[in-house]
């Protein structure tokens, strides 16, 4: 396994610490007037998303991990797994439901998603940043429902419930930001 020293730290670099994969979020080399130099760093657990702050002596070695993101097309859910297809090799990859997690509410068949790999081990799924979807259920809007800032719940075709402006009705196509689940615009 390739190792990396604290002198080679960069934001976004992949590390394996105690059998977990992390990315470096932030780091700082500290050289106090008295005592040895050390490094203060923050890492994000790839699977859980938790951020952890640590310190270590300067020059400490860590196992490095090659993080790669590849485009896959979401095909379908077979009940237990989500099936994705590699756009280059046409290989189908089953992804367990617990690995997709909350992102499942943004997946539509044939959407292009990003799959994150750490040394060829699948670590996570990222849906497209924006999706264009249809409102399948919401309370009807009435003439004059254009008051700035007022919203109502709406169910979209993926099953997710989001807040939309009062003037939108069922059947309208909208653009949604999948990072925070917010309405962006009409399409």
Predicted regions mapped to residue ranges:
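Acidic-enriched and Gly/Ser
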Residues: 2-157, 161-187
